[in-house]
From Swiss-Prot:
Keywords: Coiled coil. Residues 145-257 are annotated as: Disordered. This is Lysine-rich coiled-coil protein 1. Signal peptide: none annotated. The keyword Coiled coil applies. The keyword Glycosyltransferase does not apply. It comes from Bos taurus (Bovine).
Length: 257
């Protein structure tokens, strides 16, 4: 037989029924939720308050002496905000943001009706002094940022200018070297040309001398051959004349001419 599901009018009735069932089974249910929550708050809330007190000292140093009142709520808010900030941010920027957030919470507490201080004029003077101090601090930080930006820009500009000047000076320094190199190349070219011309002149002189020598030798050979030819002709002529005389004598003796 299936049990029908009970319906309860309130959570309290359901809780009482649950306790009865657990006790019938011999169990002791834990129903002190409020007590556990209070114990948790006492343990962890106290730690949070203790951890937040050193951060409240920073605000006490900024405010004038005798007018400082700590606010654990603002410090706990700053602590939670610091935990939520990303880890890559610098410590200086995170502190500045925490200071601004904590002081904004402090001003809200000053002007809100929740923590009504006994001396309202004193808190107003504290809030006004904080606003003046924060304005001066922001102005100084902005001036520092602008001066650092200007200094970095000036350094970069000077560096570029120096590089450009060095780039301009380098060709001027290299010009004499280039000129000397060009002059040396021209001298070498002239020397090469003079050597080539001297070689060609010597070659032409040699060729001309050889031609003259050959001509002289040819002429001498021609003269010698002509002399030999004349000598032969003369000898032949003389021989011819002698034969004719002999022939004439022979003819006279034999033939009777």
């Amino acid at each position: 037989m299936k049990h029908s599901k009970k319906t309860y009018d309130s959570f309290q009735d359901e809780l009482e029924d649950y306790i009865k069932v657990q006790k019938a089974r011999g169990l002791e249910p834990k129903t002190c939720f409020r007590k556990m929550r209070e114990d948790y708050l006492e343990t962890y809330g106290y730690k949070e308050e203790v951890d937040s007190r050193p951060r409240c000292r920073m605000f006490e140093q900024r405010l004038p002496y005798g007018t400082v009142q700590t606010y654990p709520r603002s410090c706990s808010i700053s602590q939670r905000v610091e935990k939520q900030l990303p880890q890559w941010l610098p410590a200086h920027d995170s502190r500045l943001r925490l200071d601004s957030l904590s002081y904004s919470q402090f001003t809200r507490d000053c002007f809100s009706g929740k923590p009504v201080p006994p001396n309202l004029s004193q808190h107003e003077s504290n809030c006004s002094s904080y606003s003046v101090e924060s304005g001066v601090y922001r102005h100084l930080s902005s001036e520092n940022n602008t001066s650092a930006h200007q200094a970095s820009y000036k350094h970069i500009h000077q560096k570029r200018k120096r590089h450009t000047e060095e780039g301009r000076e380098k060709p001027e320094e290299e010009r004499p070297k280039h000129k000397r190199k060009k002059a040396c190349e021209e001298i070498d070219l002239d020397k090469y040309k003079s050597i080539q011309t001297s070689k060609t002149e010597a070659e032409t002189v040699r060729v001309s001398t050889e031609k003259l020598k050959n001509r002289k030798e040819k002429r001498s050979r021609d003269v010698a051959s002509k002399k030999e030819e004349r000598k032969r002709r003369k000898e032949k002529k003389e021989q011819g004349q002698e034969r004719t005389e002999e022939e004439m004598l022979w003819d006279q003796s034999i033939l009777g001419f």
